Amino acid sequence: MSQPVERSPASTRTVFFVSDGTGITAETFGHSVLTQFELRFKQVRLPFIDTPDKAYDALRKINETFAADGQRPIIFSTLVKADLSSIVRQSQGMHMDLIQTFVEPLEQELGVKSTHTIGRSHTSTDSEEYKNRIEAINFSLAHDDGQSHKNLSAADVILVGVSRSGKTPTSLFLAMQYGIKAANYPLIPDDFEREKLPGGLQAYKHKIFGLSIAADRLAEIRNERLPGSKYAALENCRYEVNEAERMMRREGIRWMSSTTKSIEEIAATILQEIKLDPPIKD
């Protein structure tokens, strides 16, 4: 079996994300792959490459980068039209064509041609999926940080945890990415003294998922916001984290630590644990 060729990596490698739409798909896939390498990357986005003139302009930019860097740029491309893709393929770059790699084999397997519609997943602003996402975002904003107890029956998931444990960004990610209606409520010292969940949540315990965090990391985050305060003191953070975890265990609430997890990993865990199945996007 052949072995990978070992090269002396340069300090920074240029990466182009080329698309005839927004470039979100190319960028998301590219990021997932690039994180597997302990190298620095300079990222260049080239969205809306939907005419030959724009494709030749992208070709010029890639070749200029090759001349300046002395090494091939890496290209992640989602150009649907073959004529545009063939232009970019003439560049002095290492070309990763996601359409050819995945769509064409699927056409053969499924026995049907794809629609080859440019930017399809990001332009269906009138679709039911888009409306659901907007509704979910509005719901999550209205139910952020315990602002409202109204209409909790409509929530898909209710996140609880100490302040600054990642509840708000996770709620908004679930809403924006999956159309999940996520409310979130802070667990505070008053709740620990009463040994009860925040008012109104008991009836929806089956929807609750908890987020915890390492006390030292929590202290770091809180000190960025309120340096030197009791709120950010390590001793207080330890108390809140310990009490919150004790409450979640007592109430039988599923929970996880967000300390070393990305928002994407947290969201994926929640979807799996709560048994939520986000719809396949158009």
Curated annotation (Swiss-Prot):
UniProt: ADP binding residues: 161-168
Family to which the UniProt record says this protein belongs: Belongs to the pyruvate, phosphate/water dikinase regulatory protein family. PSRP subfamily.
EC number assigned by the record: 2.7.11.33, 2.7.4.28
Group of enzyme by EC: transferase
GO molecular function, one term: phosphotransferase activity, phosphate group as acceptor
UniProt cross-references to PANTHER family, sorted A to Z: PYRUVATE, PHOSPHATE DIKINASE REGULATORY PROTEIN 1, CHLOROPLASTIC
Origin organism lineage: Bacteria, Pseudomonadati, Pseudomonadota, Betaproteobacteria, Burkholderiales
Organism the protein comes from: Janthinobacterium sp. (strain Marseille) (Minibacterium massiliensis)
InterPro entries: Kinase-pyrophosphorylase, PSRP
Keywords: Kinase, Nucleotide-binding, Serine/threonine-protein kinase, Transferase
The protein's name in its UniProt record: Putative phosphoenolpyruvate synthase regulatory protein
Pfam families: Kinase-PPPase
Catalytic reaction list: [pyruvate, water dikinase] + ADP = [pyruvate, water dikinase]-phosphate + AMP + H(+); [pyruvate, water dikinase]-phosphate + phosphate + H(+) = [pyruvate, water dikinase] + diphosphate
Function, in words: Bifunctional serine/threonine kinase and phosphorylase involved in the regulation of the phosphoenolpyruvate synthase (PEPS) by catalyzing its phosphorylation/dephosphorylation.
